[in-house]
Amino acid sequence: MIGSLKLSFVLALSLSVMHVLWCYPVLSSKVPGKPDYFLILLSSCPARLEGSDRLAFLKPILEKTSMKRSFRNGVGSGAKKTSFRRAKQ
């Protein structure tokens, strides 16, 4: 059980690190005259898209979470109006 949790954690961590490193160039070699074969091309990186295209897939999710429900008399707004009055007495 714990072994499978460790394996899934390592897999998820490695996938997230690979995604981050996929969009950034690898450090170039410091040997002069030697070509750098390990430079990752950034033209295929999704993070280089324009701002409107980059977050287009998140737009429906953000719209749902930012939608606020209105209730009458402040019920459900998160503010407990009577608890402060009780504590004051």
From Swiss-Prot:
Cysteines paired by S-S bonds: none
Highest rank taxon of the organism: Eukaryota
Keywords, in A-Z order: Cleavage on pair of basic residues, Neuropeptide, Secreted, Signal
Main location: secreted
Protein localization: Secreted
GO cellular component, one term: synapse
A Pfam family it matches: Neuropeptide_S
Gene Ontology terms describing biological process: neuropeptide signaling pathway; positive regulation of action potential; positive regulation of circadian sleep/wake cycle, wakefulness; positive regulation of synaptic transmission, GABAergic; positive regulation of synaptic transmission, glutamatergic; synaptic transmission, glutamatergic; visual learning
Signal peptide segment: 1-23
KW Ribosomal protein (keyword) present: no
Propeptide cleavage-removed residue intervals: 24-69
Presence of the UniProt keyword Secreted in the record: yes
InterPro entries referenced in this protein's UniProt entry, alphabetically: Neuropeptide_S
Protein task: May play an important anorexigenic role. Modulates arousal and anxiety as well as increases locomotor activity. Binds to its receptor NPSR1 with nanomolar affinity to increase intracellular calcium concentrations.
Descriptive protein name: Neuropeptide S
Species for this entry: Mus musculus
